[in-house]
């Protein structure tokens, strides 16, 4: 019998403004427990933290075990931008009034430029946070109903058909020493195909706690082992007869399920071997082949594309603002250079070295403009270049001010020397006049 024509639906709940979609799994088959009586689901969810890395939180009530996880198919953007809040101030606070005004303008220039860069970086961080918030709104809550060992053998027909409806994935389990549960698997598959809905997936899990996972590539050893022992391979004509000491050949079982295109896993509830792989395999099958989950994935990708387009538009606007700021900064820079030239002229400082510095600064401004044009496609790089340009301008200002201060100190020193010489000459003349007057008095 084929599966029902009804399509699978996904129930949606709202929790803290997040859309949570319910993914339902049903576990059926024989009794699969560890030596301590712990079921495979409990072992997977509760007793090994290494096996629940993909899950946020979970709770268990009676036969239901629920846990939440983020739908990891949605890509997320996590970009951290380094923000340079450092502002370089001039140390020449003891200069004349003109020099202090020059420092004040220079500090305002740096403050404005750094504030603009910080605003642009904050805009980028806000856009990235919006992307992460949009992605986190899509979550999947997985609901597992464990009916293994509740309905087996003659009671298999007593399971109501409503148990199969709305189930996205089925886990058929059996123990390697329980040939009855193994031989009932064809009935379970037939039941699932009869009552389940489209796009539902099946995996078969065998619990083998006595030995390690066999090598399925060794086909020769499997035929010899099956002939030398009372192992019953699975087929639809096998009768459910209890045979003492009979087990299941996992290699033959694996070949059979491969022919049915059903994934088959050998796990160990005692050692946790392959348990995580089995659950994740079923989750992947459902996500990759179910058009409903593909729709949510595409919807999430569209949201990310829209957010990226908005980020690009914001980056372009930020680049335009940066260009305007750079133009204003260049004008302020030229005005500051003119103030420095006037100050040097008033103090009779040689203008040749200062003019050379101005030419170098003009070249730096041209390079800054080229860098700004090249960095329009990347706002973060543009902000970093602006900070570097500010540092270069500050260094140039400081060098010019140091030169000016040194020249003023030299002039002041020379002036003091000249004053001392003049005072000494006046003192010498007075001494000579006193000596002359003394000589005249003696002669009289």
Swiss-Prot record:
Lipidation (S-geranylgeranyl cysteine): 441
Residues of the propeptide: 442-444
Positions of the UniProt region annotated as Disordered: 91-136, 213-232, 298-401
Alphabetical keyword list: Cell membrane, GTP-binding, Lipoprotein, Membrane, Methylation, Nucleotide-binding, Palmitate, Prenylation
Membrane among keywords: yes
InterPro entries found in the cross-reference section: P-loop_NTPase (IPR027417), Small_GTPase (IPR001806), Small_GTPase_Rab (IPR050305)
Bias-annotated ranges (Low complexity): 95-135, 217-232, 303-399
Entry's localization field: Cell membrane
Binding positions for GTP per the UniProt entry: 29-36, 73-77, 207-210
A Gene Ontology molecular function term of the record: GTPase activity
Lipidation feature positions (S-palmitoyl cysteine): 439
Modified residues (Cysteine methyl ester): 441
PANTHER family with a match to the protein in the record: LD44762P (PTHR47980)
Family: Belongs to the small GTPase superfamily. Rab family.
Record's protein name: Ras-related protein RabX
Phylogenetic placement of the source organism: Eukaryota, Amoebozoa, Evosea, Eumycetozoa, Dictyostelia
């Amino acid at each position: 019998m084929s599966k029902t024509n009804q399509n699978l639906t996904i129930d949606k709940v709202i929790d803290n403004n997040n859309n949570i979609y319910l993914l339902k799994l049903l576990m059926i088959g024989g009794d699969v427990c560890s030596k301590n009586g712990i079921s495979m689901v409990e072992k997977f969810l509760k007793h090994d933290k290494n096996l629940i890395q993909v899950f946020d939180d979970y709770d268990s009530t009676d036969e239901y075990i629920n846990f939440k996880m983020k739908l990891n198919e949605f890509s997320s953007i996590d970009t951290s931008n380094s923000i340079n809040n450092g502002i370089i101030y001039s140390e020449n606070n003891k200069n004349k009034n003109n020099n202090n005004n020059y420092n004040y303008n220079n500090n305002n220039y740096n403050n404005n430029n750094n504030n603009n860069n910080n605003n642009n970086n904050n805009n980028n961080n806000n856009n990235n946070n919006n992307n992460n918030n949009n992605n986190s709104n899509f979550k999947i809550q997985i609901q597992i109903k464990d009916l293994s060992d509740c309905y087996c053998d003659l009671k298999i027909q007593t399971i109501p058909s409503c148990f199969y409806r709305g189930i996205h994935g089925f886990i058929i389990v059996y123990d390697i020493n329980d040939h009855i549960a193994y031989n009932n698997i064809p009935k379970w598959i037939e039941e699932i195909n009869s009552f389940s809905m489209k796009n539902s997936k099946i995996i078969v899990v065998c619990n083998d706690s006595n030995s390690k996972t066999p090598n399925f590539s060794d086909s020769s050893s499997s035929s010899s082992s099956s002939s030398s022992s009372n192992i019953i391979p699975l087929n639809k004509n096998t009768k459910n007869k209890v045979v003492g000491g009979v087990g299941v050949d996992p290699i033959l079982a694996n070949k059979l399920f491969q022919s049915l295109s059903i994934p088959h896993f050998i796990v160990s509830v005692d050692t946790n071997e392959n348990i995580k792989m089995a659950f994740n395999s079923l989750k992947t099958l459902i996500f990759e082949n179910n058009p409903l989950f593909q729709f949510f994935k595409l919807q999430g990708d569209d949201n990310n594309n829209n957010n990226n387009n908005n980020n690009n538009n914001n980056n372009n606007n930020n680049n335009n603002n940066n260009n305007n700021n750079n133009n204003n900064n260049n004008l302020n820079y030229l005005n500051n250079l003119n103030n420095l030239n006037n100050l040097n002229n008033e103090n009779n400082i040689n203008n040749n070295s200062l003019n050379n510095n101005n030419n170098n600064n003009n070249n730096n401004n041209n390079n800054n403009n080229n860098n700004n044009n090249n960095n329009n496609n990347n706002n973060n790089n543009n902000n970093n270049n602006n900070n570097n340009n500010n540092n270069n301008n500050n260094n140039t200002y400081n060098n010019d001010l140091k030169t000016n201060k040194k020249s003023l100190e030299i002039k002041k020193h020379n002036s003091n020397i000249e004053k001392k010489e003049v005072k000494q000459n006046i003192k010498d003349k007075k001494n000579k006049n006193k000596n002359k007057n003394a000589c005249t008095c003696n002669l009289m």
